[in-house]
Amino acid sequence: MIYVDTSAVLKLVVAEEESASVADYLSEAAARGDSLVASMLLYTELHCAGHRRRIPAGLVNDVLAGINLVDLARSDLMFAAAMPGHLRSADAIHLATAIRLQAALLVAYDTELLTAAVEAGLDVASPTHQPEH
């Protein structure tokens, strides 16, 4: 199971430097049978970002359809609130949910979240295409 953070999924609806890399990475993971998962917080964050950037809701929903969205648990919120460090609320909630779900990997592009995830014992990835030599 691969937990996907908003910083990664947003690249699937907004053209950014790593957009092709993360799309390829997640497509390959799905082809291998890995499930993509996130908390319902992703639904809210992605739709709000879509509204701000005038991204059609249909495109946002198409991307979300490939991700298993799980409900937040009260324990996720409590655990996120108790986390040491300087994570923003949403990042702490995503990390708490990934830990509860025992995700094998967290895909994100937020440096603070990635650092906290590694400190919590999770494997992490921020896919980028490496130039060929």
Where in the sequence are the language-model features?
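Alpha-helix capping/helix-boundary segments
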Residues: 8-9, 42, 76, 94, ...
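Alpha-helical elements of the RecA-like P-loop NTPase motor core of helicases
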Residues: 20, 48, 78, 114-115
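Short glycine-/small-residue-rich flexible loop motifs, especially phosphate/cofactor-binding loops
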Residues: 47, 61, 95, 114
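Short beta-strand scaffold positions
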Residues: 4, 37-38, 71, 89-92, ...
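Short, well-structured N-terminal submotif of metal-dependent ribonuclease cores
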Residues: 1-37, 50-62, 120-133
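Acidic catalytic patch
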Residues: 63-85
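Acidic, PIN/NYN-like endoribonuclease modules and their adjacent C-terminal/linker elements
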Residues: 1, 28, 43, 70, ...
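Amphipathic alpha-helical segments within well-ordered protein domains
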Residues: 7-10, 47, 81, 99
